[in-house]
């Protein structure tokens, strides 16, 4: 199934914040990618530049957790926290980034 990049939606929140994603009525969320951790240095730097300890880390269950909460629903909210995803890189400021589309149910 080919999906135009223009259809892909991307949302991101810093650690300890809630991410809410939603689709128009009659459409459901399809998760393409989700990462809880860190891929980029300049995003959500944290206090005193805490991101510098580990710039590339990712919780292995990131996508599964978000899919379980969101897949097929018209909207969902996920808390970006170690209590939800585990801590893939202690001492590093993390964020949750989700890429998804809205698809007709």
Swiss-Prot record:
Residues 13-103 form the SUEL-type lectin domain. The keyword Disulfide bond applies. Keywords: Cytoplasm, Disulfide bond, Lectin. It comes from the Eukaryota. The keyword Signal does not apply. Its main location: cytoplasm. Pfam families: SUEL_Lectin. It is found in: Cytoplasm. One of its GO terms (molecular function) is carbohydrate binding. Gene3D superfamilies: 2.60.120.740. One of its GO terms (cellular component) is cytoplasm. Homodimer; disulfide-linked. This protein binds D-galactoside. May have an important role in the activation of eggs (triggered by fertilization), or in their subsequent differentiation. The dimeric form is essential for hemagglutination activity. This is D-galactoside-specific lectin. It comes from Heliocidaris crassispina.
């Amino acid at each position: 199934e080919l999906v135009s990049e223009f259809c892909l939606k991307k949302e991101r929140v810093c650690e300890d914040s809630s991410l809410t994603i939603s689709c128009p009525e009659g459409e459901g969320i399809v998760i393409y990618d989700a990462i809880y951790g860190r891929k980029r240095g300049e995003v959500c730097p944290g206090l005193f530049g805490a991101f510098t300890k580990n710039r590339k880390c990712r919780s292995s269950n990131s996508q599964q957790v978000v899919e379980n909460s969101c897949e097929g629903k018209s909207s969902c909210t996920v808390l970006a926290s170690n209590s939800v995803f585990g801590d893939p890189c202690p001492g590093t400021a993390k964020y949750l980034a989700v890429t998804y589309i809205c698809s007709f149910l």
